[in-house]
């Protein structure tokens, strides 16, 4: 029991010290701790969430849960009808959308006579042939409309155009990112693809903040296939949406077990992520940790200064305590308890703000970045780790100044001598 006496007395002194301290001082320290915790969690969470928004968009509106594409040595997915029959017999699959993809050129104002040296109002693009109903069931393409109407299966000579192909929605003057001028819903453009030339009407504009979608022109597949000489029913991409609860890795392996990998690449949405997206995830996570670490150092210094000033101010009081027999260890423990109080209350307040306020709000109202809808990515494990880091840093910052003051001469402290 004697070993616990310094702890009990230290706790009593800490409680007394907190109660007698200025209410505004306590509030200020707690706010600093809460803001420090938010800095540790939110800054890295938003930076990671910015890239997570890109990943979410690509998964939702492009690859879906499983993505099948042509092998590198082939121009298309061989034996597509066989693959579709395999997919049809897997009960965990909710919907499938095969696509035909071909490079092409879109032209606006193509009837205007230009000099030979002029480039013209044109842009290189990717031409996609889709079944509008199947594509919408898998990727929700119709939800990306920002102008006009969605395609129907009978919409021949009508197309959807990605926003990055139009100057009205992507006004960047660069040869690397060509965009059409004076083109909007209702405009007629000329499409050149695989030697075929077709005049089509823009029925709708789509924007997703993913280049794979926003730099495409979408045709009804039954019209595009004859234009590119594709009469064999082979596709270039197949996006697969799973039923809720189905595991993409398990279904991918099941599809591969049926021999589909002999004719195409079968990937989960994570496998199909572009490498630059994966690299950006790691980079932004590192940046978030660096910025959070700076905030942690600032908070530690703040706690150190507050505890040190508090201890210096009560130097005479500390000397009297030592004079009546209270050990220096007990006094140090009391200041550690004070630091624990500020750390626990501040961290708890920060957790409430994150999980009850910021996280649900940003999920419902993502931050509108130019290339993604940013969300706040926080995990329970990550939150616990950061809370522990802040707690330990606060304890150290509370102990060191108390130790420095307590080690002083007792008589000098009582008499106020330096």
PLM regions and their residue ranges:
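Short helix-loop junctions at transmembrane helix boundaries
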Residues: 333, 347-392, 399-412
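Transmembrane alpha-helical interface segments in multi-pass membrane proteins
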Residues: 295, 308, 317-362, 393, ...
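Alpha-helical transmembrane segments of integral membrane proteins
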Residues: 29-39, 285-305, 339-350, 385-386, ...
């Amino acid at each position: 029991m004697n070993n616990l006496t310094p702890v009990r007395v230290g706790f009593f002194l800490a409680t007394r010290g907190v109660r007698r301290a200025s209410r505004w001082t306590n509030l200020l320290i707690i706010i600093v701790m809460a803001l420090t915790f938010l800095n540790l969690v939110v800054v890295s969470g938003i930076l990671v969430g910015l890239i997570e928004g890109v990943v979410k968009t690509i998964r939702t509106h492009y690859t879906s849960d499983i993505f099948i594409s042509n092998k590198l040595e082939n121009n298309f997915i061989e034996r597509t009808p066989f693959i579709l029959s395999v997919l049809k017999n897997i009960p965990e699959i909710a919907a499938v959308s095969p696509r035909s993809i071909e490079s092409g050129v879109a032209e606006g104002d193509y009837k205007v006579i230009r000099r030979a040296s002029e480039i013209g109002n044109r842009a290189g693009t990717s031409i996609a042939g889709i079944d509008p109903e199947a594509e919408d069931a898998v990727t929700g393409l119709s939800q990306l409309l920002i102008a006009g109407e969605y395609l129907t299966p009978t919409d021949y000579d009508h197309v959807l155009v990605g926003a990055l192909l139009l100057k009205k929605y992507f006004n960047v003057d660069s040869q690397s990112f060509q965009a059409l001028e004076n083109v909007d819903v209702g405009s007629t453009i000329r499409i050149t693809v695989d030697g075929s030339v077709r005049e089509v009407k823009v029925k709708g504009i789509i924007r997703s903040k993913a280049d794979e979608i926003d730099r495409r022109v979408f045709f009804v597949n039954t019209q595009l296939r004859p234009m590119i000489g594709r009469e064999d029913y082979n596709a270039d991409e197949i996006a697969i949406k799973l039923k809720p609860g189905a595991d993409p890795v398990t279904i991918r392996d099941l599809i591969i077990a049926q021999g589909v990998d002999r004719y195409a690449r079968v990937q989960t949405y994570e496998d199909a992520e572009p490498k630059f997206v994966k690299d950006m995830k790691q980079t932004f996570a590192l940046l978030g940790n660096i910025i959070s670490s700076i905030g942690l150092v600032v908070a530690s210094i703040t706690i150190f200064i507050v505890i040190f000033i508090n201890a210096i101010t009560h130097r005479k009081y500390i000397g009297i305590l030592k004079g009546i027999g209270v050990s220096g260890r007990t006094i140090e423990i009391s200041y550690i308890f004070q630091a624990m109080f500020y750390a626990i209350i501040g961290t708890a307040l920060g957790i409430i703000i994150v999980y009850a306020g910021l996280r649900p709000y940003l999920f419902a109202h993502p931050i509108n970045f130019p290339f993604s809808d940013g969300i706040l990515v926080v995990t329970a494990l990550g939150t616990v780790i950061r809370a522990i880091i802040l707690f330990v840093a606060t304890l150290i910052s509370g102990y060191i100044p108390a130790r420095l003051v307590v080690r002083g001469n007792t008589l000098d402290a009582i008499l106020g001598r330096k």
